[in-house]
């Protein structure tokens, strides 16, 4: 859902930089583990949950998505009716439904909780997919909301942020001590802050791999959920349509994680599994 690259990454990166500055100003260092852990958790989880709370606003602003309040045509009436039916079947509150301009076949879901979500589709999806295929895509996004993927991603990102902040400073302190020996006064030199910055980038790379692994895992679950809501054959047909029409996404990178676009990145950094793997998983499933 909410959830790269991922919707949180840009904000979380900024928070990591801010955390580095604040901790340096406050003199927090690896020898003060309790203080370090508290500060790391505040900044680590703070960035994720700020992103989560602002996710709908950020998504609307960055994509130009227009929420349907009063349907203007049959397509919008169908969208609202389909989402309402699927939301009821999934046991969640009715999400806001929006349409954004974009030639790609794509959709995303975001929001702070299961009962306060946003589901948006591109005009490219509406123009290039049949109603059955679009219904499956909507089911996929509703499944993201029903599965609680947004809050789970926020929690995971918070843990990863905290891990990066703490480990970078602990390892940075060890390396700095080894390089400089026992510095008089026990203070940290300029090299320490350079080392910490570099380590945050390196550990952040590994953290991204973990979050991308979770993102791929949740896509399989959302596909299964979409198949349950709309039908397995419709879900397979929607993914096959994507294979035929996979163009370059115009979604911002922080939103694309919640869409259903392909990726040219290496698999470890892909937010979505390859389409052929998703189709194979659906064919092997027992969902009707």
From Swiss-Prot:
InterPro entries in UniProt? HtpX_protease (IPR050083), Pept_M48_protease_HtpX (IPR022919), Peptidase_M48 (IPR001915)
- Give TM regions: 5-25, 35-55, 155-175, 194-214
Query: What is one Pfam family matched by this protein?
Result: Peptidase_M48
Free-text cofactor note:
Binds 1 zinc ion per subunit.
Tell me where it mainly resides. membrane
Where does the protein end up?
A: Cell inner membrane
Q: Name one GO cellular component term.
A: plasma membrane
List of catalytic residues: 141
Query: Top-level EC class, please?
Result: hydrolase
How is this protein positioned relative to the membrane?
Multi-pass membrane protein
Q: What is its EC number?
A: 3.4.24.-
Q: Which cofactor does it need?
A: Zn(2+)
Recite the UniProt keywords alphabetically.
Cell inner membrane, Cell membrane, Hydrolase, Membrane, Metal-binding, Metalloprotease, Protease, Stress response, Transmembrane, Transmembrane helix, Zinc
Q: Where does Zn(2+) bind?
A: 140, 144, 219
Q: Which GO terms describe its molecular function?
A: metalloendopeptidase activity; zinc ion binding
Q: Which GO terms describe its biological process?
A: proteolysis
Fetch the HAMAP family from UniProt.
Answer: Pept_M48_protease_HtpX
Family that this chain belongs to:
Belongs to the peptidase M48B family.
Quote the protein name from its UniProt record: Protease HtpX
Species the sequence originates in: Stenotrophomonas maltophilia (strain K279a)
Q: Lineage from the top down?
A: Bacteria, Pseudomonadati, Pseudomonadota, Gammaproteobacteria, Lysobacterales
């Amino acid at each position: 859902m909410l959830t790269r690259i991922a919707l949180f990454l840009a904000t979380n990166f900024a928070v990591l930089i801010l955390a580095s500055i604040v901790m340096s100003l406050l003199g927090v260092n690896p020898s003060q583990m309790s203080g370090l852990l508290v500060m790391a958790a505040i900044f680590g989880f703070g960035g994720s949950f700020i992103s989560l709370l602002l996710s709908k606003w950020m998504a609307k602003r960055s994509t130009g998505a227009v929420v349907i309040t009063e349907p203007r045509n049959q397509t919008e009436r169908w969208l609202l009716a389909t989402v309402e039916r699927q939301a009821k079947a999934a046991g969640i509150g009715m999400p806001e439904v929006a349409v954004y301009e974009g030639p790609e076949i794509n959709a995303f879901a975001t929001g702070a909780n299961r009962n306060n979500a946003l589901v948006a589709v591109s005009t490219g999806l509406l123009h290039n997919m049949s109603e059955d295929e679009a219904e499956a895509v909507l089911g996929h996004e509703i499944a993201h909301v029903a599965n609680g993927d947004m809050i789970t991603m926020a929690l995971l990102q918070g843990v990863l942020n905290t891990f990066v902040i703490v480990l970078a400073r602990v390892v940075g302190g060890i390396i700095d001590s080894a390089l400089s020996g026992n510095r008089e006064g026990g203070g940290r030199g300029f090299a320490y802050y350079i080392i910490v910055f570099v380590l945050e980038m390196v550990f952040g790379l590994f953290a991204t791999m973990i979050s991308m692994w979770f993102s791929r895992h949740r896509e399989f679950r959302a596909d299964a959920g979409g198949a349950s809501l709309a039908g397995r054959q419709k879900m397979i047909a929607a993914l096959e349509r994507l294979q035929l029409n996979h163009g370059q996404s115009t979604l911002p990178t922080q939103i694309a994680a919640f869409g259903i676009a392909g990726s040219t990145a290496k698999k470890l950094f892909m937010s979505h599994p390859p389409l052929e793997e998703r189709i194979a998983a659906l064919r092997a499933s027992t969902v009707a």
